[in-house]
A protein has these predicted regions:
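Conserved structural motif at the start of ABC-family nucleotide-binding domains
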Residues: 8-10, 23-25
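Short coil-to-beta microelement around the adenine-binding A-loop and adjacent beta1/P-loop entry
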Residues: 20-21, 80
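The feature captures the beta-strand-to-loop junction immediately N-terminal to the Walker
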Residues: 39-41
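ABC ATPase NBD Q-loop/coupling interface
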Residues: 65-81, 146
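ABC-family P-loop ATPase nucleotide-binding domains
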Residues: 94-168
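Walker B catalytic motif
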Residues: 174-175, 182
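Conserved beta-strand-loop-alpha-helix hinge in the C-terminal portion
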Residues: 219, 223, 227-250
């Protein structure tokens, strides 16, 4: 009996920039339908990990592998990884004046899932349902991509793309930053809708446990100085909220004073 490979499997990943090491041997496995959280303070390597999975050319991998459904993707260009099923939501999405949201969504879905997936009544029903779930008015489709969007609108637009494209792997980098509690609940609802019970998987990168109160992760991983030093269930996120990160710094290494709070951005 064959067993499907994990959606994402990272083995002994070492990477850096300009001969400066940032990731120092990461191992991570995410199965289909699972949501994992990668937590850590600023500078721990979380966003670097996301960029390397997506293929950012600025970073160099010196050792290890990154597999998507059993296929090593490290030699792929970023656009090839996107077409293979990797989706990255950005902390600071760029505005594209002149490109309407509706056209952008249709082209994106067609590029990943084929032309037939981006036309006809089924696509329109899916789009209408996803926008309703995210409390987005139909007039949003006529606006230009991220042009004049509020922080909350940018985040909801990222999740709308996720819900329509249905990637194999969604990497959500600081999706909860700048959102109030209602915005977090709305975004979390979209993430759950896109991933739970599907063949997709998600990696949520965050400092705090706010969004994890509404998107219950299957596993939580703590990244410190480029290494995953602890993994656990959702209760680990709550423990970090109470205790911060200092207690997880390996003995003999410098400790930087930082406390994780529910309100600090």
């Amino acid at each position: 009996m064959s067993v499907d490979p994990p959606v994402l499997e990272i083995r002994d990943l070492h990477a850096g920039i300009d001969d400066t090491p940032i990731l120092n041997g990461i191992d991570l496995k995410i199965e289909s339908g699972e949501i994992h959280a990668l937590m850590g303070r600023n500078g721990s390597g979380k966003t670097t990990a996301a960029n390397i999975i997506m293929g950012h050319p600025e970073f160099e991998v010196s050792k290890g592998s990154v597999e998507l459904n059993g296929e090593d993707i490290l030699e792929m260009k970023p656009w090839e990884r996107a077409r293979a099923g990797v989706f990255l939501s950005f902390q600071y999405p760029q505005a594209v004046p002149g490109l309407q949201v509706g056209n952008f969504l249709r082209k994106s879905v067609a590029a990943i899932n084929g032309e037939d997936a981006a036309k006809g009544p089924e696509f329109r029903r899916t789009l209408k349902s996803a926008m309703a779930e995210l409390d987005m008015p139909r007039s949003f489709l006529g606006r230009y991509v991220n042009d004049g969007f509020s922080g909350g609108e940018k985040k909801r637009f990222e999740i709308l793309q996720l819900m329509l494209i249905k990637p194999k792997l969604a990497i959500l980098d600081e999706t909860d930053s700048g959102l109030d509690i209602d915005g977090i609940k709305t975004v979390a609802k979209g993430i759950n809708s896109a991933v739970r019970g599907s063949d997709s998987a998600a990696l949520i990168i965050t400092h705090y446990s706010r969004i994890l109160e509404h998107v219950k992760p299957d596993r939580v991983h703590v990244l410190i100085k480029g290494r995953i030093v602890k993994s656990g269930g959702p209760e680990l996120a709550l423990e970090l909220e109470e205790r911060g990160y200092d207690w997880l710094i390996p003995s003999g290494e410098d400790s930087e004073s930082e406390t994780v709070t529910a309100t600090k951005d």
